[in-house]
Regions:
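Short C-terminal tail/terminal secondary-structure segment
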Residues: 2-7, 159, 234, 245-260
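A glycine/serine/threonine-rich, flexible loop-to-helix segment
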Residues: 3-6, 54, 108-109, 193-218, ...
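Substrate-binding pocket helix/loop in short-chain dehydrogenase/reductase
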Residues: 105-111, 115-120, 214
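Active-site helix of classical SDR
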Residues: 134, 170, 178
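Residue(s) in the substrate-gating loop at a strand-loop-helix junction
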Residues: 154
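Short, small/polar-rich loop/turn modules that mediate ligand/substrate recognition or access, typified
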Residues: 186-190, 244-246
Length: 260
């Protein structure tokens, strides 16, 4: 009989992750590798990718490769997929964590800081990256039948948080895209959202999040730690969620259900 814990293992599977840096992406990449997956991590910053890759390979026997990409550019995503296949073969898991287009309304700019350029970046990175990676990996997933695409959602996709309007609209559209892909790509590929709240923000982001009272507006009344999204990311990646698709798993401290 298969152990319950074995359903969470990812041995021999290959995972592509975007937006990997200090925070949720790094923790998820390390968790997938620890559970047996080959991981291909990507972000815009080569320096942080080198550090994370070295740490994974030192611990997990050389199952990580890094690729510097802009998730909003199709040609970069094509290169990411090609690199993953060249190193590890067919792709099983896509974890879409890259995000862009967040406007904080500095210096009184407010909603009009959502320029055409901001709108384009938000839609390209937050929405189209999921669509493009689904298209680019669907042949692999259709063949082996164990595909899992996970897109990181935001509380901003459920309720308006001005002035981050372009970001919120792109995340709301992502919800519909994920449900549509889940129906279209079943049964060989499952597609789900992971809604992540304010996870240990730092620097300017922390100041803004505190100013908005985001920690106080969720049920648990604190910011999350970056590793608190890992359990849900593991669940959605493998056989433990084999009957789950078109869904959203929430790791946001109860904020979506309680926000004013």
């Amino acid at each position: 009989m298969t152990s319950v814990l074995d359903r969470f293992r990812l041995d021999g599977r290959t995972a592509i992750l975007t937006g990997v840096g200090p925070g949720v992406g790094e923790h998820v990449a390390k968790a997938y590798a620890e559970l047996g997956a080959n991981v291909v991590i990507s972000a815009r910053s080569a320096d942080r990718l080198e550090r994370i890759t070295a740490e994974i390979n030192a611990r997990n026997g050389g199952r990580a490769v890094a690729v510097t990409v802009d998730a909003g550019r199709r040609e970069d995503l094509e290169r990411l997929v090609e690199t993953a296949r060249d190193n590890f073969g067919p792709i099983h898991i896509v974890f879409n964590n890259a995000a862009a287009g967040i406007v904080y309304g500095k210096d009184g700019g407010g909603i009009w800081d959502n320029t055409d350029a901001v709108w384009k970046e938000a839609l390209d990175v937050n929405l189209m990256a999921t669509w493009r990676l689904a298209e680019l990996t669907t042949a692999d997933m259709q063949q082996h039948g164990k595909g899992s695409i996970i897109s990181v959602e935001s509380c901003g996709g459920f309720t308006p948080i001005p002035p981050a309007i372009a970001y919120g609209v792109s995340k709301a559209a992502l919800l519909f895209a994920v449900r549509s892909l889940a129906k279209a790509l079943a049964p060989h590929t499952r597609v789900n959202c992971l809604c992540v709240g304010s996870m240990s923000p730092d620097g300017q982001e922390a100041e803004i999040h505190r100013g908005l009272g985001l920690a106080e507006r969720n049920a648990i009344k604190r910011f999350g730690a970056a590793d608190e999204a890992v359990g849900a990311a593991i669940l959605l990646a493998g056989d433990a969620s084999s009957y789950t698709t078109g869904s959203t798993v929430f790791t946001e401290g109860g904020r979506v259900g309680t926000i004013a």
